[in-house]
C-alpha cells in the first residue's frame, strides 16, 4: 500500500486550508492509500493572527489520523518534526504553501525529509506571491520551493508566479476541486428560515473572511448605487473581519445601508456553511486581487451563480454570461453586474453551472 502524509493545517485548526486538506486525505483513503495529516501545534502566534480564534468548534473529522506537531516559530521543532517525518519513509508528502511566513518552517522540515532518499515531495501552491507583501517574502519562498520535487497550482495566475521562482521542475495546473464536505444542498426556503432571513428578499452573498484585497468596501459602495437600491437587493456578509471593521461601518452609515446589509460578521463554522450558500441567490467575489478562491468551488457545489471581478484566476473559473458575470473591480461595475444578474434571473445560469460543475471533481 502506498503511503502519503499531507502537511498543512488540519483539525482542530479551522478554515479553508484545513477543510481542503481533510477532504484530500479522505480521497487518498478512498483510493487505497495509507494517509495521515501533519498539522500545527502552533500555526500563527497570537500577535500575527487577525481573527478571534484559530480553532474549530465543529466535531473532529472521522477516520483521519492527524498529528499536530509543527511550531511555525521554533527552529528546534522544525528539525525534530523533519526527522520524525523522514523516518516514516512515506512514498509521498503533499505540502500546502499559502504564505511566505511558513517558508522557513516547512522548508526546513522538507529538507530533513529529503535525506531519506525515498520520499517525493509535491507542493500544492495556493499562493506564491502573497496578497500583502512583507520583507523577506521572496527569500522564504525560494528556500521552501527548493525542497519540493514538483508542484500543483489551481490557477494560471499562481502558475505564472511559480515560474518566476522555479522554471525547471514539473508543475501541473488543475482546477480547485469542489468543497463537497459541507453537507447536502438544502431548499432556499429552509436555509433562509435557519438564518432568519426573508423568504422573498433578493439576497446576494459575500462569504469568507474580510481583508482589503477582497473588496468588500467596493461591494458596499456598489450597494449604494441608485440602480442597485432601485432593484431592492440586499447583501448578506458572512465572515469574520481580519482587519479594522470601522471603514466598512462608515460606508454603511454614510449611505444608509443598515437595512440592506445583513452583517453576520463572525467565523462561519463548517456546520453552517450550507445554510449560507443555499440562502443566497448569487455569490459575489468583488476582489481587488486574486489567484484563485476557495469560495468559487463552494458556489459550484451548491449550484449558485457568481459575480466575480476580472482579476487573477477568477475569470477563468467563472465563464462570463454562463455560470455568472464578470465585471471590473469598481463599485459602478459591480453594481451594474448585480442589477444585470437579477434582471436575467438565476435560472438562466443553471444549465451552464451544472455542466461546468462536473469539471471540478476530486478524481
Please provide the spans of the model-predicted regions:
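N-terminal strand-loop element at the rim of the active site
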Residues: 8-14, 26-87, 158, 163, ...
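Glycosyltransferase donor-sugar binding loop
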Residues: 40-44, 234-249, 266
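Acidic anion/phosphate-binding donor-loop and adjacent secondary structure
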Residues: 134-135, 163-164, 172, 177-194
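Acidic donor-binding loop of glycosyltransferase active sites
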Residues: 275-291, 304
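Conserved acidic donor-binding segment of nucleotide-sugar-dependent glycosyltransferases
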Residues: 320-332, 339-346
